[in-house]
Amino acid sequence: MSNGLRTSFERISLFHPQGFISESSAEFCCSAPSNLSPKFPMDHWERTSSFSPRCRHPDLRVRLQSSPPRGPQSDRNLPSLQPLELHGDRPGLCDVHETLQVQKIGLRQSKLLRTSKLPSHRGRFRSIPLHLHLSSEVRNRFHARCPDVLQPLSDTRPLHSVPLSSEAPLQSSCSPRKLLHRPLSPPKPLHLHNFRQHSSLCSRRSPCRKLRPTPRCNQLAQAQQHPLPSSKPLSLQAGILGPCPLPPHNKRSPSPAVIRKTAGILPHPKLPPSSRGHLPSSTSSSSPRSNRGVRCSVHLHKSRSNSQDLRSCRVRSNSLQQTPILMGHFKSLGQSPNLRSFERPRPTRRSLRLLPLSPQKVPTVHVPTHQQSGHKGPSLPRPHSPSRQTHHARLPHSKRVSLPNSVLHHDRPKRPIHFGSFPINVAPSHLLPRKLWSRASSPPTCSPTTSNHGHPEEALRFLPKNLPQHCQMALMENYCSHFSSPSSSVSFPEDHQSSLPPISTRWVQCSSPSFSLQSFLVIGDIPCPISFPLSSPQSHSSESLRGDSPPSSHLPSSPSSACSGDSFASCSSFGPSNPTSSASALGGNHFNFSFFS
């Protein structure tokens, strides 16, 4: 450097203590200019320069570093290598004139910047002019960095006293700042446009009513026992990219499309049969936790032997029923496993209706007449049900027989029934001697050529055990005569038809179960009064319809009951409470009859 101080040394100087360079370094002294002092201080450990700023030069450096400082050091506190400063006057340093100009630029840059003033605030700080006279109190309130800004004054004003009221205020759920800055205002009605003034413009529109908003009220304290329904969490709400694909928890309600099919369910009959080629025949039972995860696709590798472990969780054991389920057919899940037959409820007391049968469809029963000269044909001494329809009873066998058309509701019978009391001097039939009973009605024997249906032993199965012997004989006679001579018809004597006055037909109803009905049977020339209590229809309605026991078991075993041996109608007096008791004596045939009085 031509116009500067030469700093190139031929050899490195030795170590010297801090502060000065030794005089023994003759080589350094010889190479140095003559105007330099032989002893000049080095950089101090506190980084304070002892040289004048005008003698500094960046190229004038000592290649020997100073000793480490006594204080603690760090990476940021290393001793800097300051350039050497020269002593002497300025005219003797003509070679370092450029060094002074460089130093001036460094001093301008190294000047510390002043601290910036804090901005003045209307509510917190108050600025005052400096030319005003300030008292000692005001001087103490000066800001530390801003002398023209005063510190805030303490507000010593008294607080407003709030009168205490007896009523406790309502507890609000929002913060108190919102209540202070949000004054409550009374609701204002919302006025809409009056369409009635312009009715021609909108004639078909109905007039609008005046809407008023709901008055706003403070929210009361929430009860802990009845909390309000929690809102939807923030994680489940829809954002910019839309709602989340899956909820964060696993406890979610299963969708109706994913329904597990149980074993043993029949496939839907309307669906076509599925193919079985692309699905395996059977799979291993999966764990119950496999259905909770996400369904995986089917990846089958032909080269691997354990390809069954890579099947999807939706592949079921029955491959025929798997395809409709994967295609989304909800009806293919089958029907209910409850395949029991429908059980019809048992009929109630009033649900069984006995309808009449037309005489054209039902064959007529031909009962042979075995009457003597003085025998009178009795009628059926039993009451009728409240309904005015003719009763017919369905018995176990399939045959149907009915009484002649003259006995039905079209023609009046030749011998009607009279309900009432007869003279006491008439002897009942059970008090007559055996000889008189045999003379009055001698029961004929059954024909030996009768079939198995007309056998007397078959009729005994349907008769109660507590009947008298003469009643059993009369029932057997009528049963055998029905199959022995089917061509005969029922005939009634006409001697009583002219003697009895014409009486209109009436129906007798059983109002109470304790009502006793007294009738009579004509045995020969002696009318025999019989009396028996009428039982309520509730006592036998359930048992007679079930068919658990023969209906003839409900016949009353009264010693005063008597029966004639001429016709089938005389045997029905033993069952006044059961409409099927008289018909069950013929082995379960179907009868149709009506009663007149």
Curated annotation (Swiss-Prot):
Residues 273-291, 535-574 have a biased composition (Low complexity). Residues 64-80, 218-234, 305-315, 575-584 have a biased composition (Polar residues). Transmembrane segments: none annotated. Disulfide bonds: none annotated. InterPro entries: 45/70kDa_tymovirus. Residues 389-400 have a biased composition (Basic residues). It comes from Ononis yellow mosaic virus. Signal peptide: none annotated. Belongs to the tymoviridae protein p69 family. Residues 62-82, 160-198, 218-315, 329-411, 535-586 are annotated as: Disordered. This is 66 kDa protein.
